[in-house]
Each structure stands twice: as C-alpha cells, then as structure tokens.
Amino acid sequence: MATKRVIHWLAKKELHESKFKWFFEAAGTIPVNRGVHHTGVMEVAEAMLEQGYVIGIYPEGTRNKTEDPIQPLKYGAVRLAQKTGAWIVPLSIAGINGAFKSNVRTCIGEPYKIAADADLDQENEILRKKLARLYLEAEEKTKE
C-alpha cells in the first residue's frame, strides 16, 4: 500500500529498548507494554487519530507465528475506530514465517467504518473474517 502519510504503528515496548531504538523512534512507532492494560497508549492513539494521523495496529496483539491464518483479535482496533470515527483498512501479510522471507506478500481490503452504536464483539468478528480472507489471498500470491 503506497501512502504519503506516515503510519504510526503500535509496537511492543521491547523494540524501543533494543539497540534499534533509534529506528523505531524515527519511524514514529508508539511503544506498547503488552503485559498490562495500556489506557495511556490508547489515549495517545485516540488523540492522534482525532488529529488526522494514521495509526497501524496489529489486532492480534502480536505477530502470528502459528499455522492458523489468524489468531483471536484484541479489541483495540475496533474500539478506536468506533470511538473516533476513523476508517479501518484491513491488511494482511503472508510469507514472513519461513527461513527465506523473499516472497512476502500483502493484501489490502476495502476501507470501512464502524457505527457508533455497533456491537464490538460482532465488529471484531467481522474484522477477523476480513483479515483471514485477505491472509489466504496473500498466501496464494506467495505460491506464484
């Protein structure tokens, strides 16, 4: 996906504590302590969305290193989109778990919004299904 806008990805805080800290700070990532409820991070992300910034969230909460196309989703992405009126642009990546990562492929879904009165459980399931479908499409592209 080509965009002129910077995507500020939520990233595990350990990346900001590594020798590559400079890179993640320069890239504009937002550190997340995955072991605790991170209201402060969500408030920062919400404020950034309301100011027109783009936030990237891995809704599974981590990279998926299993055989399953998608793990259960956390609620941060749908909750933020519902609260701020931001668009969700589903994106899935395949081909990153092998020894050779030269065949990585992405698939991007249609942007959509979540209604202010929508049920978050249902919206999370809708997002999960969209991501699973996109993952299968991306995986097929890795075989080409």
Q: Model segments located where?
A:
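Catalytic core of membrane glycerolipid acyltransferases/transacylases, capturing the structured
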Residues: 1-36
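Short secondary-structure boundary micro-motifs
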Residues: 6, 13-14, 31, 39, ...
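Short acidic-hydrophobic sequence patches enriched in Asp/Glu that either
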Residues: 19, 37, 72-76
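Glycine-rich, highly charged phosphate/nucleotide-binding loops
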Residues: 36-42
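Non-catalytic C-terminal accessory region of glycerolipid acyltransferases
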Residues: 42-144
